[in-house]
Amino acid sequence: MAREDVGAPPDHLWVHQEGVYRDEYQRTWVAVVEEETSFLKARVQQVQVPLGDATKPSHLLTSQLPLMWQLYPEERYMDNNSRLWQIQHHLMVRGVQELLLKLLPDD
């Protein structure tokens, strides 16, 4: 089975509302936390979501996910708290573009 090319991952992901992010092309991405033993993962899928007004960061519920991710060298993202997230995979899953990000431990 041929693997579908998904291109480059988004350069930026900004939180729009709880669990929903926007990229630099205004596409929406839904993020879900996956906790495994001692590390945190985020499954982020590019899904069309109708957007209302953006939620103010101070009004967001407490979340383990950041307000923003920015693409960083070596297949990683840096979040607004200066934490690094490794891109575990970036592929198409049943026609949906998906990123799996793993929070790296502090050095």
Curated annotation (Swiss-Prot):
GO biological process: intracellular signal transduction
Tissue: Not found at a significant level in any tissue.
InterPro entries: TCL1_MTCP1 (IPR004832), TCL1_MTCP1_sf (IPR036672)
Pfam families according to UniProt: TCL1_MTCP1
One Gene Ontology MF term: protein kinase binding
Gene Ontology terms: cellular component: mitochondrion
Assembly description: Interacts with AKT1 and AKT2 (via PH domain). Does not interact with AKT3.
UniProt record similarity statement: Belongs to the TCL1 family.
Role summary: Enhances the phosphorylation and activation of AKT1 and AKT2.
Stored PANTHER family: PROTEIN P13 MTCP-1
Protein name per UniProt: Protein p13 MTCP-1
Organism of origin: Mus musculus
